[in-house]
Amino acid sequence: MQEFTNPFPIDSSSLIHCMTNEISCEMLANGILALGCKPVMADDPREVLDFTKQSQALFINLGHLSAEKEKAIRIAASYAAQVCLPMVVDAVGVTTSSIRKSLVKDLLDYRPTVLKGNMSEIRSLVGLKHHGVGVDASAKDQETEDLLQVLKDWCQTYPGMSFLVTGPKDLIVSENQVAVLENGCTELDWITGTGDLVGALTAVFLSQGKTGFEASCLAVSYLNIAAEKIVVQGMGLEEFRYQVLNQLSLLRRDENWLDTIKGEAYE
């Protein structure tokens, strides 16, 4: 597995602006705090630029989209592109909503650092057959061979952008690097917002100077390894959710956590 540099300790002055949905807002805020950064959630078009200007990274999640939120997203993304602010776009629900898919394609013009989605969402976005329903991926969409080739082509069209594709095996693709990561546990599917949290953690690592590829690999591995440490037979849903956030704050103390990343990376 490729050697990554430990991103901890985190610069505690880093502000991460999350434009996310109301369902996962609290989890993302606590997850960002657990890693040592400061979260802010502002999606009113009248103030979004003020908060984006103060931020060290921007995370855009399309959950609970509205006309007003779309306006705010476009304002923030435009500014991020102008000043080269690291930006993560999470293509939530593009399998179902033509409005969201159109918005994501517009946001590509602002050159996000990372474009994230589950297997079905990314397959839909790049024009491949998919079976996604709502905001969930389908087990029928986990084949990566055809997707990988298309993503490599897209990375040439959008240089500097990385794809983070979540699934039983997570796929990260940049212009000249590919990683297939295998940490994680099915229990993460028990609770809502864990996919959103991966996007927020990616923004955290981007704020520390990591590339899109590095930040994506670190973020998805960090959450998955944290979850692996707390899987206990018979644990209830709410207890698991609590322990996920708890472990996020503890894992960074382990200087050897990077050694537990499972998977492969290649050029």
From Swiss-Prot:
<keyword id="KW-0547">Nucleotide-binding</keyword>
<comment type="pathway">
    <text>Cofactor biosynthesis; thiamine diphosphate biosynthesis; 4-methyl-5-(2-phosphoethyl)-thiazole from 5-(2-hydroxyethyl)-4-methylthiazole: step 1/1.</text>
</comment>
<keyword id="KW-0784">Thiamine biosynthesis</keyword>
<feature type="binding site">
    <location>
        <position position="116"/>
    </location>
    <ligand>
        <name>ATP</name>
    </ligand>
</feature>
<feature type="binding site">
    <location>
        <position position="166"/>
    </location>
    <ligand>
        <name>ATP</name>
    </ligand>
</feature>
<dbReference type="InterPro" id="IPR029056">
    <property type="entry name" value="Ribokinase-like"/>
</dbReference>
<feature type="binding site">
    <location>
        <position position="193"/>
    </location>
    <ligand>
        <name>substrate</name>
    </ligand>
</feature>
<dbReference type="GO" id="GO:0009228">
    <property type="term" value="P:thiamine biosynthetic process"/>
</dbReference>
<keyword id="KW-0808">Transferase</keyword>
<dbReference type="GO" id="GO:0000287">
    <property type="term" value="F:magnesium ion binding"/>
</dbReference>
<keyword id="KW-0479">Metal-binding</keyword>
<dbReference type="GO" id="GO:0005524">
    <property type="term" value="F:ATP binding"/>
</dbReference>
<protein>
    <recommendedName>
        <fullName>Hydroxyethylthiazole kinase 2</fullName>
        <ecNumber>2.7.1.50</ecNumber>
    </recommendedName>
</protein>
<comment type="similarity">
    <text>Belongs to the Thz kinase family.</text>
</comment>
<keyword id="KW-0460">Magnesium</keyword>
<feature type="binding site">
    <location>
        <position position="41"/>
    </location>
    <ligand>
        <name>substrate</name>
    </ligand>
</feature>
<keyword id="KW-0418">Kinase</keyword>
<keyword id="KW-0067">ATP-binding</keyword>
<comment type="function">
    <text>Catalyzes the phosphorylation of the hydroxyl group of 4-methyl-5-beta-hydroxyethylthiazole (THZ).</text>
</comment>
<dbReference type="GO" id="GO:0004417">
    <property type="term" value="F:hydroxyethylthiazole kinase activity"/>
</dbReference>
<dbReference type="GO" id="GO:0009229">
    <property type="term" value="P:thiamine diphosphate biosynthetic process"/>
</dbReference>
<dbReference type="InterPro" id="IPR000417">
    <property type="entry name" value="Hyethyz_kinase"/>
</dbReference>
<dbReference type="Pfam" id="PF02110">
    <property type="entry name" value="HK"/>
</dbReference>
